Amino acid sequence: MSETDAGAPGAPEAAEGQAPGIRILAQFIRDLSFENPRAPDALRAAQTQPQIDLGVEMNARGREDGLFEVDLKLSARATRDDGALFVVELLYGGVFQIAGVPAEDLEPVLLIECPRYLFPFARRIIADVTAEGGFPPFMLDPIDFAGVYAARKAQEQEQVGHA
C-alpha cells in the first residue's frame, strides 16, 4: 500500500539549475514485533528448511514543515509443516528533505529512492532480532523497490479500469 501527499505545504519545487538532492534527517523504528511461538522447541535443528513468506510496503507523506516521512514495512514469517517458527514485523521510518525534484517525479523518489536508503538499516534490525530469538540471522535479499512501485502502479491502474 503506498500513499503520497506531494502537495504538502512547503513541498519542493524544481528550481532552475538546482541539482536534485535527498537528505536523510532522521531514521527510527516506528514499530517492531518478533514472535517466537514455539520456543524453545522450534530452535532444534530440523531436516527441512522453513518456508519464508515476505511482505514489503512503502508509504510516504508530506509534513507541514516541507519535509517528508517515509515508512518501510518489512514482514517475514517462517513456517514448517508443524507450524510457525517466527514472525517478525518492522515498520522503519525516515524523515527526508527533498530538493530540486519536479512535482511529477516526487512520488517515485519517495517510494523508490527513500526506501532504498532505509533498507540496509531495516535489514540489519531484522537480522539482529532473529538472531536474538535463537535463529540464524535472517538476511533479507535486496529488494527491487522500482519493481514493487511499478507493480503497485499497475495494480492501481487495473483497479481504475474496473471501476
Swiss-Prot record:
The keyword Chaperone applies. The gene is secB. Its main location: cytoplasm. Homotetramer, a dimer of dimers. One homotetramer interacts with 1 SecA dimer. It is found in: Cytoplasm. This is Protein-export protein SecB. The keyword Ligase does not apply. Keywords: Chaperone, Cytoplasm, Protein transport, Translocation, Transport. One of the proteins required for the normal export of preproteins out of the cell cytoplasm. It is a molecular chaperone that binds to a subset of precursor proteins, maintaining them in a translocation-competent state. It also specifically binds to its receptor SecA. InterPro entries: SecB (IPR003708), SecB-like_sf (IPR035958). Pfam families: SecB. It comes from the Bacteria. One of its GO terms (molecular function) is unfolded protein binding. GO terms for cellular component: cytoplasm. Belongs to the SecB family.
